[in-house]
Amino acid sequence: MEQLRKHLVNSLKGGQAFVPVEKAMNNISRAARNKKPDENLHSIWEELEHMRIAQEDILQYMINPEWKSPEWPEGYWSRPVTDLSDEKWDKTFNGFMKDFIKIIDLVNDPKIDLLAIIPHTTAHTYLREFCIIVEHNAYHVGKIVDIRKALNNW
């Protein structure tokens, strides 16, 4: 089980098959945070805020039997903002990282049987939820990197 925990943590942190979150988010210019390279794409902030919301939802689903998930899809995407303040950016980034650390801690918790069904669910295991986070974050980190490249901010 320890090898599986180690593998999950490495997968969550990235750097094996995709860019680590910290690297993807490093040195983003203020001007690029809320800019769309194309009208059909999201901004970096919109992608990160979506990641924060989805990650929080999955974390709370695992640890809080009373948690109610947002409505799909509108509850998982914030409305675009025209003026993104530093405070709003920091709230999104710090919220994402805070939950990310909680997820790593949960993966490493020896009291959690990764293969067990989450007690207040009917069929979902911790492993399933952690794998969804890995996949989802990897996908959106890739989109953030592409947006940064398109904005000449990579």
Identify the meaning behind each predicted range.
Residues 4-12, 18, 22-25, 30-77, ...:
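Short, contiguous alpha-helical
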Residues 80-117, 128-133:
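Acidic/histidine-rich alpha-helical segments that form the ligand environment
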